[in-house]
């Protein structure tokens, strides 16, 4: 699983005009899954199911 920064650099993710992360493949806004036991959150695309981790 890649980080959101690496996804932005590779062109897999984009930011919209309000700074929200969107999937470049399907254009959907990413959902956030927060596990309190982990150091990172997981950003998930609802349409294609791809995941990226985001350090808090």
UniProtKB/Swiss-Prot annotation:
Annotated transmembrane regions: none
Residue sites binding Zn(2+) per the record: 23, 26, 45, 48
A GO term for molecular function: zinc ion binding
Superkingdom to which the source organism belongs: Archaea
Motif, C(P)XCG motif: chain positions: 23-27, 45-49
Effect of residue 23 to A: Loss of structure and stability
Consequences of knocking out this gene: Cells lacking this gene show a late onset of growth in synthetic glycerol medium, a lack of swarming during the first 3 days, and enhanced biofilm formation. In this mutant many motility and chemotaxis genes are down-regulated, and some genes encoding pilins and redox proteins are up-regulated.
Recorded consequence of changing residue 45 to A: Loss of structure and stability
Known role: Zinc-binding protein that binds one zinc ion. Is involved in biofilm formation, swarming and glycerol metabolism regulation.
Assembly notes: Monomer.
Annotated protein name in UniProt: Zinc finger mu-protein HVO_0758
């Amino acid at each position: 699983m890649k980080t959101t920064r690496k996804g932005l650099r590779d062109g897999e993710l984009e930011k919209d005009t309000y700074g929200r992360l969107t999937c470049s493949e399907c254009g959907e806004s990413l959902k956030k899954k927060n596990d309190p036991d982990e150091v990172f959150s997981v950003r998930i695309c609802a349409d294609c199911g791809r995941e990226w981790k985001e350090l808090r």
